Amino acid sequence: MERAVRFSTKKSSETRLLRVGVDLIDRLGIDAVSVGKIADEAGLTRPTFYSYFESVPGLFATIWMEVGPQWLRRMSDLDARPEEFDGVERTIHRAMIEILTAAHRMPEAFEVVQPTVAEWWRGVQREGQFHAEKVSWLVGQRIGSELTAPIDPEVVTSGIASTVLAGMPVRSAMPDGRDVSVSLPELSGISAVTDDFDAKVIVAAIDVIARSGVKGASMIRVARRAQVSTGSIYPRFESLDEVIDRSFEHALRAVVADNLLRAKEAGTPADYGELIIAGLSPSRETWRNFRIEIHLEARHSPPLASRLAASIKESNDVIVTTSPYLRGIPLEVVSPVRYFIYALGIGIAVLHNAGIPVARLDHSRVSVEFARSIERMIG
């Protein structure tokens, strides 16, 4: 098994800043980290920080260089159990999840994260295409589970994926090289063109958050994106928080509910694999990233976490009635699998943003074998 992830034991100002940076990401969230907070907590000056990293994203890039390759290997190790990591590794794990998730919108971090992820993925692919497909599900579940855990702790039960994937064959009975883009289902997205003023503001807020995160949004940016004045927004929305709340309702509850209802047409596990691929289409990019950013922010915002937890429950209730996996499965297995389906959707989107070609993988093969593995587990 891959050994636990640790920082260098050398004592230096740089190492101290790195450790403090990781701790702040874990406690406050990646978008709340600042030079002042890092320097103050490390007991060092701001010029000392700038001499090492130049910027906060530069710190994230250095953290990734220090432990990223080892952490990726650990994430793709079937024998590893992230939910059982000790205190130090647990903190590093949560921080690395946030860096990987946000890196695509931070050029200075992404220029380090992307090539490291690409090198790791080349190693995964050397084990075969079906192996790569299974790893994408394992790592996707682990990412999605960690992003969701502070919001709904029951998501840790999705770790059943490790056992299920371990029970799958080395090779799939389905052939390599299938065209996975044929006859994909059309999934609902977020309309970007509307004459309704409130809807125009909501769609603009969704777009800004998807590009820059919740903390990167402001009423001025939303107004510019909607091509309206800030003064025209305030009579209809009391604050930016209300805009975000309304955006949340529109993008998460409405779109998720619509797409899960469409999933009723997925009569087999193979159809579910096609739904995953369809969800990675370019037309769904804004929706995917908005959903990711809401999870990233809710990890450190109890009010938002409470609203998102209710949305997760609604989604899971629909999953129970629509998923081809859950027909005839005992109750004790239903809950972990529905959380797995939820976590996988988020984690696969994060891998997609990191440059992994998950949209070109044949998820139907893994989906079919996953269902068979569950059947073997329950006898």
Predicted regions and their residues:
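Hydrophobic alpha-helical connector segments
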Residues: T62, R73-A95, N259-R288
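Amphipathic alpha-helical packing segments from all-alpha helical-bundle domains
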Residues: P107-V139, R284-E285, N289-I292, P302-R327, ...
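Short, basic, alpha-helical segments at the C-terminal edge of helix-turn-helix-like DNA-binding modules
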Residues: W64-W71, F248-V256
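Short, structured motif recognition centered on aromatic/hydrophobic residues
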Residues: I30-V33, H93-A102, I244, V255, ...
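Short amphipathic alpha-helical segment with a characteristic S/N-K-E followed by hydrophobic residues
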Residues: L17, A32, S55-F60, G216, ...
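Short, amphipathic alpha-helix enriched in basic
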Residues: K10-K37, E41, G189-R221, R225
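Short hydrophobic/aromatic patch on the recognition helix
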Residues: A42-F53, A226-F237
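Hydrophobic/aromatic-rich alpha-helical bundle segments in the mid-to-C-terminal region
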Residues: F110, Q114, G128-I190, A305, ...
